[in-house]
Regions:
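Intrinsic disorder/low-complexity signature
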Residues: 1-2, 69
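Bacterial N-terminal signal peptides that target proteins for export
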Residues: 2-10
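A compositional/structural signature for long, glycine/proline-rich flexible linkers
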Residues: 24-478
């Protein structure tokens, strides 16, 4: 027979077990542990919080200039990005976009694409909340024929419906989609608009002619405050994103348990103000260290023109790259670097982005201090299956640079307009002032200050992927 003391001991053990497994508030944690966990949380969560900024501006905040439309509605623009577009850093002006968000919690969705001209590059990029590019549809993967594709969340189980070409499975129920449709020139905008109008999205129930399932209640999306990604509010947004994730991804359970000790987790109960002052201060330090870690990784790899091909991709690709190329235990830093330099960039097989942060002498690019050139020797233009471009970005805003030509890039679709050198070489002029002695067709206007350049190779050939071909350096003009 148990004594009262024994019963109380058993009860205490049970209560302790339940608290350890199901507690929603922060557990006892030292400032040192809080600092380390906050640093880890920042590197892990930065891409998701930056993604939330885009989600909120595009889908939730109807008063935002960047607002696109509600969930599960294809939204396209037959235009190119300008300096007024500020929601996505390092934007692309080569291919008019359709950009929209899916909510798969109720049921899967079917996305259909039209037949495309054989020489036109296009693709549909599908990105989960982690910012993994989990699937593609398009020229390089499924071809230019018409097709329909079933997009499903992590909990869906079923068979491939008739009329659907493939199932594309996301780790998360919330998905971002970007379609890119090649523009051959200003006169081609009408045709691009026609193609965009043929992109179609249907709930699975409508596609098969069945009854629609109940719609789950909408999450309580917190208002986005610009700058939150760089201060204490970051942790609240990460907490919310974990409610959308619901469960940890592969290998993430230990991190989620550590975050739970700070009160950050899928129940959405995080309250930074309720934490002890010394823990708040430790988390501030950890957050700053996390951002410094991202910046340090970028700086350490600034001389690698092909780094973009290593930081965008599937979960599996990033894990392999982190281990093989950088000897890292996980790929969180790769996702964060990608989000910081250019959210929603493409996987290497679709496009790579050789990036210029410094000139051939190792000095940061600065339009107020120098004029520059990039010269492609004869036969050394970027090797691509589709096309290539070179785009200018302001070094402070990471956006396009206003200029009198409204020119933000040079690309291979205008090769006939370039002035070639006698031996067949191509020299591009990178400077803030209009050139005096050279054709303006080769001029890419720079800001009166720091800048960086991104070369985009769509459908890169093997020589570009394995380093056999390397981008020429940016040379200071003599």
């Amino acid at each position: 027979m148990r004594t009262n003391n024994q019963r109380l001991s058993v009860l205490a053990i049970m209560v302790g077990f339940l608290c350890a497994c199901g507690a929603s508030g922060p557990a006892a944690i030292t400032p040192e542990e809080a600092e380390a966990t906050a640093r880890e949380a920042y590197v892990y969560g930065f891409p998701m919080v930056m993604g939330y900024k885009t989600l909120y501006n595009y889908v939730i905040d109807t008063s935002n200039p960047e607002y696109k439309g509600p969930f599960n509605e294809v939204v396209c623009e037959a235009r190119l990005f300008t300096p007024d577009d500020k929601a996505v850093v390092t934007p692309n002006a080569d291919t008019p976009y359709c950009m929209f968000w899916l909510d798969l919690r109720a049921e899967p969705l079917v996305f259909s694409v039209p037949e495309m001209e054989p020489d036109r590059f296009y693709h549909v990029q599908l990105v989960d909340l982690y910012t993994h590019n989990f699937a593609y549809v398009g020229t390089l993967t499924t071809g230019n024929d018409a097709g329909s594709f079933l997009i499903v969340g992590p909990g869906w189980e079923g068979e491939l419906p008739e009329g659907v070409d493939d199932v594309l499975r996301s780790e998360t129920d919330i998905v971002f989609i970007a379609t890119r449709t090649q523009l051959f020139g200003p006169d081609d905008l009408t045709r691009v608009a026609e193609i965009q109008q043929e992109y179609a999205l249907q709930p699975l129930s409508a596609f098969v002619g069945g009854d629609a399932p109940p719609t789950p209640p909408a999450p309580d999306f917190p208002a986005w405050a610009e700058g939150s990604q760089f201060d204490k509010r970051f942790f609240g947004y990460l907490d919310f994103m974990m409610t959308l994730l619901g469960t940890p991804g592969p290998g993430e359970q230990p991190l989620w348990e550590r975050l739970g000790r700070l009160g950050i987790g899928p129940d959405g109960s995080f309250d930074f103000a309720a934490l002890p002052p010394e823990i708040q201060e430790a988390m501030k330090t950890g957050r700053e260290e996390g951002f410094a870690e991202i910046e340090a990784f970028i700086a350490a790899n600034s001389s690698d023109p092909l780094i973009s091909g290593k930081v965008f991709g599937t979960r599996e690709f990033l894990a392999e790259t982190a281990a093989a190329t950088y000897q890292l235990e996980n790929a969180d830093i790769l996702r964060s670097v990608a989000a910081h330099r250019g959210l929603y960039g493409n996987s290497a097989a679709e496009a790579i982005y050789p990036t210029y942060l410094s000139d051939a002498d190792g000095s940061p690019l600065d339009g107020s201090a120098n004029q520059y050139t990039i010269t492609f020797a004869e036969g050394q233009l970027p090797p691509v299956e589709a096309f290539w471009s070179l785009t200018m970005y302001d070094g402070k805003t990471q956006l396009f640079v206003e200029n009198p030509l409204d020119r933000y890039l040079l690309n291979s679709t205008t090769m006939d307009d370039f002035r070639m050198e006698g031996a067949g070489a191509l020299t591009l002029l990178i400077q803030k002032d209009e050139p005096d002695t050279h054709s303006t067709s080769n001029w890419l206007p720079a800001p009166d200050g720091p800048f960086y350049l991104v070369m985009r190779l769509y459908g890169p050939e093997a020589a570009a992927l394995d380093g056999t071909w390397t981008p020429p350096p940016v040379e200071p003009a003599e």
